[in-house]
Structure formats: C-alpha cells, structure tokens
Amino acid sequence: MQSQVRQNFNSDCEAAINRMVNLEMYASYVYLSMSYYFDRDDVALHHVAKFFKEQSHEEREHAEKFLKYQNKRGGRVVLQDIKKPERDEWSNTLEAMQAALQLEKTVNQALLDLHKLASDKVDPQLCDFLESEYLEEQVKAMKELGDYITNLKRLGVPQNGMGEYLFDKHTLGESS
C-alpha cells in the first residue's frame, strides 16, 4: 500500500536510508563490543568502556532517528541483518580508538553519499535533515577521536601501559 504522506521522496533515497540504518546499527554493535571488552576484569579500563558504551547508544539513536524519518516521509522501513563486528578483542585503547575513527569516517562518507544522492534527486528536506541532525555531529566525533588518539600516543601507548591507565582515569574519567 502506498503512503498517503509521501511526496518528493525518491525510492533510491528510501533504500539508502534503510542502508544507513543498518550501518548505524553495525556501528552501535561494534562500539558495544568494544565497551564490554574494556570492561573485562583483565582489561579494567572502566572509563574507556563507558565511553564506548555511550558511543554505542548514540549510534543506535542515530539509526532510530533515520527510522522515524523514513516513516515521516512515507517511506518503508526494511531492516537487514547486522554484521558481526570484525573483532572481539583489542590490544590497547589506541588501537580501539583508531578503529573507532575509521568507523566514524566510514559512517561520515555514507552520510555524504546520501546527501549527494538527496541533492541529485532534488530532495531539500532530506538534505536539511542530514545537515541539521548528522553532518556536524560526525565532524565533532571524528575530531574528538583524533584528539584522543593524539593524547594516547603522547602518553606512550601502546608501549606504556601506565599511559593507558592515565588516559582512562584523567581524560575519560574527567568527562564522567
């Protein structure tokens, strides 16, 4: 059955939004896996675990925002299987933060591709939604991760386990 509220909403944009939902849920899943790795008793970096858990919640909220938008525009939600994270273990916080930055860049590129598609299909509402809800936040997230990576390297991680502890306690512990 066709939606009665659908207007100027291209089916390519609708399909791309469903793919974005899947990517955001995958990102949430990766961050959740990271969180519980750093919460293990033999890793015990609780502020790092908390940071990644918050990232997981944020990514899930992004997916839900896309789901709500899809319905608002008269599109149809088509959920897909969420891929398992490629790893379950991390050598250190630096390695995990670098992987998180790469993940955020992947999400950012997908958002930019969706914005281009919306622009090509002359969908100013979708462009506005992406600009107001996602694009600036992605830039901030990438900057934050970049700063964390710089500070972890400055503290001598991965060679210096004390640096990892200090980062957990003082950098992430301060934001708690």
Swiss-Prot record:
Superkingdom per UniProt: Eukaryota
Encoding gene per record: fth1-b
The keyword Cytoplasm is annotated on this UniProt entry: yes
Binding site for Fe cation 2: E59, E104, Q138
EC annotation from Swiss-Prot or TrEMBL: 1.16.3.1
Other remarks in the entry: There are three types of ferritin subunits in amphibia: L, M and H chains. M and H chains are fast mineralizing; the L chain is very slow mineralizing.
Keywords, sorted A to Z: Cytoplasm, Iron, Iron storage, Metal-binding, Oxidoreductase
Location in the cell: Cytoplasm
Name of the featured protein: Ferritin heavy chain B
Family of this protein: Belongs to the ferritin family.
Species: Xenopus laevis (African clawed frog)
Catalytically driven reaction(s): 4 Fe(2+) + O2 + 4 H(+) = 4 Fe(3+) + 2 H2O
Function: Stores iron in a soluble, non-toxic, readily available form. Important for iron homeostasis. Has ferroxidase activity. Iron is taken up in the ferrous form and deposited as ferric hydroxides after oxidation.
Subunit-structure text: Oligomer of 24 subunits. There are two types of subunits: L (light) chain and H (heavy) chain. The functional molecule is roughly spherical and contains a central cavity into which the insoluble mineral iron core is deposited.
Binding residues annotated for Fe cation 1, in chain numbering: E24, E59, H62
